[in-house]
Structure formats: structure tokens, C-alpha cells
Amino acid sequence: MAVALQFSRLCVRPDTFVRENHLSGSGSLRRRKALSVRCSSGDENAPSPSVVMDSDFDAKVFRKNLTRSDNYNRKGFGHKEETLKLMNREYTSDILETLKTNGYTYSWGDVTVKLAKAYGFCWGVERAVQIAYEARKQFPEERLWITNEIIHNPTVNKRLEDMDVKIIPVEDSKKQFDVVEKDDVVILPAFGAGVDEMYVLNDKKVQIVDTTCPWVTKVWNTVEKHKKGEYTSVIHGKYNHEETIATASFAGKYIIVKNMKEANYVCDYILGGQYDGSSSTKEEFMEKFKYAISKGFDPDNDLVKVGIANQTTMLKGETEEIGRLLETTMMRKYGVENVSGHFISFNTICDATQERQDAIYELVEEKIDLMLVVGGWNSSNTSHLQEISEARGIPSYWIDSEKRIGPGNKIAYKLHYGELVEKENFLPKGPITIGVTSGASTPDKVVEDALVKVFDIKREELLQLA
């Protein structure tokens, strides 16, 4: 599956749209000539293109009208029970069930496994996959497309590919929506899709199956509130992540900060260098955030009123810390009594993300020899599980499937910031205790397959000693 399909945005020239009142109110637009649909490469240094629409275009009204249209579905097609039975056969694990029924700890030979008390498929992911499966059953003869990977897990994405659900192709860094025809069905993934892509699909009159996680749409509602109150959205996330791209498309003015270091820089700029001295000139600011700000962003004018939002898969504690920093920054600049006019906050932290992070914080306090973190290598929430374990100094191995283990006692894994590492003899000799967790997009069966590989290595070790 091409990496270039991630982080997609539309670039639309303003002259390609004209007014049409019946679609989304007085500010609606209709297409007059061909769209140029660009996709970023996923490169950290690549720009994240944005749609250029009339200033009167109301994304909230458009989305509301879209959800009420006959060609839109976000609740499935009445095949939930049989679909969940199929998913249960494909994705569940007897080993993990044994762990859960035995207090999340169990031993197989020389291997004791301690399982995090919250792990794996979250409700939003299970719902997205279920609806995608239902769509295939509901439309057995139609061509099914998806605007991006349904979730960040190679096993699930391959399964949908086998079901003939195709990802919109990319040529010359451009997403080719021209392949989509009127009678086709297009699935929006769990991360959501930008309002620009929704507009194009609605314009084509295709059947839209929306699997966007409700927690993601909650963030969209938050940035729309920021926009209504003329607050700039400070989005804690990765500017080239699909979810953040979609969220930004619903915002007014925005800036995306990846971590506390970038948040400190922004707050130092707001305070004129009186926070920690990390910021510099306006020109340097604009260069630093050139791929992470809204069109026409001016830090001197657009950081007077700010609201916090987040990519739902980021570290909960860091999002909260950034929010507190922004609030205290506004207190320092404008006075405690005036802070409500300069800072606004709504809780947009995903319960599932929080639960999985809390569970691994608990697990790293256990006595374990190593941590096995299972999840897609492009999964943001899984990277943070790895980060938490690494920070505690535990040997931690982030793999996306059992294929990363072997031959023999060897593993290929990623560190939380993405570096690929290979290690020989990663399993210590003798009895071992391993911690196990998995990202919110990871089926239990993938974790089981990895554990079976571990058991096989330790079993071979015992046979050699016999």
C-alpha cells in the first residue's frame, strides 16, 4: 500500500468554484473545472497542501447537510451481528483471552506474559472496520474505494484489499479522484477525511460510507467552536497525519504543534521572548511552522486568542500540559481576570487513547525483562506506547507483525521516533517475564501470532539444553 496515500489534501484554485446556494447555504461552492488533487509524500519536510475555498464557505453547514443526504451512511447497513461474528473469527485470540481471565498474567513454559489492562482494538476502530465490512456485503457488485488506509494496521488493510476495497490511487503526488464514478461507493477511514475531499465526493454523487471515529468528529466540533469565537486553534498533533489534516480543514486560523518544545516556542513568541527565550523573529517563526499553519497566518495577530485541540492519538499528559502552558501564557500577557477572552479549552482527549496510556504506565511499574509493543509502524498511538516504555528504560520492541521476529532469536523493530533497528538475541536466556501491549488499531490475533513466535524461540532453547 503506497505510503503516499497518507496525508492527502486537495489543492483547488479559487477560480474552479462558483456559487451554488442549494448545497451548503449562501457560502456553498460548486466545481466548474477539473480539480488538482495533491497528496504529500509523508516526508516531514513536505508541505501539507490545503484547499483554497471562498471565505464564505461554511464547512460546518456543508458537513451537516452532507450527513443528511441520501448518499451518506455512517451507521452501517443492518449486518452488524454477522459482521462482528466474522471479525471475531478473524481477529480474536485464545491466548489473550487466557491472559484476561487469569488476571492479565499467565505463564507458558519459561515465558511469563503480563498483558496491559487496556490494549488493542478500541471501539472507534472496531466500528470503522465493522462498517467497512458491512459496506462490502451491502454493495457486492459495486466498486468500493477508500480515501486512505481504514486504520493504521497492515493486517486489517490487507484484509480489505483482499475484499476488493481499493485505495484511491496516486499519480505524481496527486490523488486520482477521477477514477471514482457515480455508481461507486467510497469509504472515509476512521481518521476522517478533510472537508475538501468530502466536497469532491459529494459533487460526484457517489455513495459515501463514513467510518470516522466519533472522537475525531468531537475534535472537529471543537475547532469549529474556536472558529466561531474567532480563536486560533492550537492543534497538538503531527501536521502530516491524516487525522490532523482533516481537523485543520474544519478550523479557521490554526497552528499545529507536535510537542512541548514547539509549544514552548509559540508561548515564548507570544510573550516577546520572556518565557524561555527560545523564539526569535517573526520570519523565523514563519519558517519553523510553514507547513503547520493556516493560510495567511500572522503570529502577531493570530495568537491573541487561542483554543487547544488535539490529534486524538497524542500523549494525553502532553496535551494537558500544552493547554496549561497556553492558559498561563495568556494570564501573564493579559491578566488573570482577562484570560477567558484569550484562551478556551474543551476536553478532546480520546478515552481509548487515555486508557491505553494509563495501562502501560501501570505495566512499566511491574518487574518485566522486556516490553513487546504491537501495532502498525505508522500508528501514532502505538508510537506513544513505545515512547512510555522506552522512557522507563525497559528494553522495548515495537513490531507491526510476527514477521519481524526471526529467524531465530532476532527481531526487527522500531523506536518511538521511527528508527528501524535489528537486534540479535533479544530474548534473554532462561525464564523471562515480558510485558505486552498493542495499539488501538491492532487485532488481538496479531499479538497472538507474535507471542507464538516468542514461545517457539524459548521452546527451541529448552530443547537445545535437554
Curated annotation (Swiss-Prot):
Query: Which sequence ranges form a coiled-coil region, renumbered to this chain?
Result: none
> What keywords does the record list, in alphabetical order?
4Fe-4S, Chloroplast, Iron, Iron-sulfur, Isoprene biosynthesis, Metal-binding, Oxidoreductase, Plastid, Transit peptide
- Tissue/organ expression: Expressed in roots, stems, leaves, flowers and siliques.
- Please list the residues that make up the transit peptide in this record: 1-38
What residues sit in the active site? E243 (proton donor)
> Which GO molecular function annotation, any one, does this entry have?
4-hydroxy-3-methylbut-2-en-1-yl diphosphate synthase activity (ferredoxin)
Q: Which GO BP terms, alphabetically? A: dimethylallyl diphosphate biosynthetic process; isopentenyl diphosphate biosynthetic process, methylerythritol 4-phosphate pathway
Compartments reported by the entry: Plastid, Chloroplast stroma
Q: What Pfam families does this protein map onto?
A: LYTB
Q: What does this protein do?
A: Enzyme of the plastid non-mevalonate pathway for isoprenoid biosynthesis that converts 1-hydroxy-2-methyl-2-(E)-butenyl 4-diphosphate into isopentenyl diphosphate (IPP) and dimethylallyl diphosphate (DMAPP). Is essential for chloroplast development.
UniProt protein name: 4-hydroxy-3-methylbut-2-enyl diphosphate reductase, chloroplastic
- Protein's organism: Arabidopsis thaliana
Gene responsible for this protein: ISPH
